[in-house]
Design a protein with these regions (language model features):
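Helix-start/capping segments and mature chain N-termini
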Residues: 2-5, 10, 14-194
């Protein structure tokens, strides 16, 4: 396959500017070509009484990401896989299902315990780049997120569990391992994507 980019050379063009423009136009190829070094994932709760919580939404999100990154994906294959995985459980589980670039599925499970203790969180030091395509998909490519452990050292080892992220517009976005949910007047709200 061949993909061409070009630009209009005018009297005040510089080679550096033209090269930068060509790289910018070709960025779409680079964003999707990263599909070799990571997997997609969804983490969900399974309980004996209710099965997988919000299963349809998890499947739809994985399907959308698989389409974006051109990963082979079958809703039916995932549903069968999750059903077989659930057959091993007798107690609530935290289930992470991973899809690699070959369409292969793998699970990681652990017993689920209701979090009764409070999490200690703090605001991240630096903003995330809301244009980073990996913020819009759940992937194993986690280097886009700051590490709570690194920031914990900055805060004197206070035992920080997670970081509240914000973007370059100073808008709160999410935590590194969870969603931000705010209750106002009895209604629950989450920020839009990144």
């Amino acid at each position: 396959a061949e993909y061409g980019v070009g630009g209009g050379i005018v009297w005040d063009s510089t080679s550096a500017d033209e090269y930068s423009e060509a790289l910018l136009k070709a960025r779409v190829l680079m964003e999707r070509s990263h599909s070799t070094g990571f997997s997609l994932f969804e983490t969900m709760l399974w309980t004996p009484n209710d099965g997988y919580f919000l299963l349809e939404k998890h499947i739809a999100r994985m399907a959308d990401s698989a389409e974006y990154f051109d990963f082979p994906f079958s809703t039916n294959k995932l549903e069968v896989f999750l059903s077989q995985t659930a057959g091993r459980f007798t107690s609530p589980q935290r289930v992470t299902v991973l899809l690699n670039r070959f369409g292969e599925l793998k699970d990681e499970t652990k017993d689920f315990y209701s979090q009764e203790n409070r999490f200690k969180v703090c605001l991240a030091i630096h903003p995330i780049d809301s244009r980073n395509v990996f913020l819009f998909h759940k992937t194993t490519r986690r280097e886009i997120y700051p590490s709570p452990r690194d920031q914990d050292a900055i805060h004197g080892g206070e035992g920080i569990d997670d970081l509240l992220l914000f973007n370059e517009r100073s808008e709160l976005t999410e935590f590194t391992i969870g969603n931000l949910v705010v209750e106002m007047d009895g209604e629950f709200y989450t920020p839009p994507l990144a």
